[in-house]
Amino acid sequence: MAPTISKRIKTLSVSRPIIYGNTAKKMGSVKPPNAPAEHTHLWTIFVRGPQNEDISYFIKKVVFKLHDTYPNPVRSIEAPPFELTETGWGEFDINIKVYFVEEANEKVLNFYHRLRLHPYANPVPNSDNGNEQNTTDHNSKDAEVSSVYFDEIVFNEPNEEFFKILMSRPGNLLPSNKTDDCVYSKQLEQEEIDRIEIGIEKVDKEIDELKQKLENLVKQEAINGS
């Protein structure tokens, strides 16, 4: 029997932070049982609390839709931890559906994550001269690759019963500084802003250089045509 839904609380919004993404590591000669010979990586896809705290009080289950080449590609995880581990050789988009507890009476949250298996470089500010540097963020050839995103689920005008459930646990505020145990922080947020600003500056510089080349080309053509 479905629970009785209480009335919604107007003009109120409640947010709860999550992280989602995947980790991956290249396998050596020893592979898990039943892993196909062509598979090169062991990976885990997940939805978690930022500090690995319990999120099952408002999330009922998480469904991951893998590539169709996997046996039973639709995997439903109905208890924490909301994650699954597989092997593979290629990157692909994973559809993630988050189902909330029945009391929420909320629609399914539907989004995608691009499974990342290979290391990549991130431009980060150079503290000496402000120029960008390349870093692999520990994603070196033999290290574990991590592709993880921080987000907030916003519940607009939750019903009274679900509001009580949400308020039964404290909201998680971002700490000021990141640590080995707590990466997601205002410091990390600022670093991401800095990376975006570096990218914008680089693009603006390239645009200006191309404009100058175009102006010089037009002037040269005018001289040659006179």
Swiss-Prot record:
CDD domains with a match to the protein in the record: YEATS_Yaf9_like
Positions of the YEATS domain: 8-169
InterPro entries assigned to the protein according to its UniProt record, in alphabetical order: YEAST_sf, YEATS, YEATS_dom
PROSITE patterns: YEATS (PS51037)
Cellular localization per UniProt: Cytoplasm; Nucleus
The UniProt record lists the keyword DNA damage: yes
Coiled-coil regions listed in the entry: 187-224
UniProt miscellaneous comment: Present with 259 molecules/cell in log phase SD medium.
Subunit record text: Component of the SWR1 chromatin-remodeling complex composed of at least ACT1, ARP4, RVB1, RVB2, ARP6, YAF9, VPS71, VPS72, SWC3, SWC4, SWC5, SWC7 and SWR1, and perhaps BDF1. Component of the NuA4 histone acetyltransferase complex composed of at least ACT1, ARP4, YAF9, VID21, SWC4, EAF3, EAF5, EAF6, EAF7, EPL1, ESA1, TRA1 and YNG2. Interacts with SWC4.
UniProt-listed PANTHER family: PROTEIN AF-9 HOMOLOG
Name of the molecule in the record: Protein AF-9 homolog
Gene designation per UniProt: YAF9
